[in-house]
Amino acid sequence: MNWFTKLLPKISTAKKKGVPEGVWHKCPSCTAVLYRVELERNLEVCPKCYYHIRLDPRKRLAQFLDEGEQEELAEDILPVDRLKFRDSKKYKDRLSAAQKATEEKEALVVYKGNIYGNPIVAAAFNFFFVGGSMGAAVGERFAAGVEAAISERLPFVCFSTSGGARMQEGLFSLFQMAKTSAVLARLAEYKLPYISVLTDPTMGGVSASLAMLGDVIIAEPNALIGFSGPRVIEQTIRQTLPEGFQRSEFLLEHGAIDMVVDRRELKSTIASLITKLTHQPPPDLPVEESV
């Protein structure tokens, strides 16, 4: 500091106050900066580009089920490292990290609740937990949810988002494709509806089993749905895939799914489908949803 700066009066600068964390959210698709409260009110659908932001399972089911009496099922079924598997990291360490990051014990949550007053069993995958992959505990939780629906003669709904089978569990993971398919066959024997909702992304062993076995298969807009990813397919066949390949709209156009439904209309759409499939009176929808 020289003699000149000593003569200058000191200027006090106020500290810039930071914006509290979580107030704003940047859309992953159009990069618009969105007010978090407005986004939640819009069910995590970007109002600018209509991109459907990925949801954790509890937020998903909170949007779908009526407020009030809800019962979580099969939460005591936990993952086990039977193979003592290790790649670049121990499987048990991956599980611990996922449980800490998501505050969940597994990649599937199952609830019994109501939609517009009608009882239902609903399950939702968690893509933030090891990519929503299906291991033995996920398959067992799913089966427990379906068995609960059978025992109480209720419809079953599943929101899928998954990278596929959990490779760290080897054949134990692949067994779940057969297990979930078998228990859904039992549900069908009792003539109880199964609505499968495919969200972004639904891939691998989940798409090749439980996700595609619904009486009605619904997808959210622009969801990636398939077995292998498009890059893997292009490298294998050495051809460029059609535009929009493996996206919801492409699958609807080619007859692989039944409907593409905006998230904000899912609850009313599924409620109407279930009443038709179970020969019940139409649900008493709020005015804004029945218009």
From Swiss-Prot:
Instruction: Name where it's found.
Output: Cytoplasm
Output the PROSITE patterns linked to this UniProt entry: COA_CT_NTER (PS50980)
Tell me the leader sequence span: none
Annotated Gene Ontology cellular components are: acetate CoA-transferase complex
What EC number(s) are associated with this protein in UniProt? 2.1.3.15
Cofactor: how bound? Binds 1 zinc ion per subunit.
InterPro entries linked to this entry: AcCoA_carboxyl_beta, Acetyl_CoA_COase_Trfase_b_su, ClpP/crotonase-like_dom_sf, COA_CT_N, Znf-ACC
Q: What are the GO BP annotations of this UniProt entry?
A: fatty acid biosynthetic process; malonyl-CoA biosynthetic process
Subunit description = Acetyl-CoA carboxylase is a heterohexamer composed of biotin carboxyl carrier protein (AccB), biotin carboxylase (AccC) and two subunits each of ACCase subunit alpha (AccA) and ACCase subunit beta (AccD).
Q: Which family does it belong to?
A: Belongs to the AccD/PCCB family.
List the protein's name.
Answer: Acetyl-coenzyme A carboxylase carboxyl transferase subunit beta
Give the originating organism.
Coxiella burnetii (strain Dugway 5J108-111)
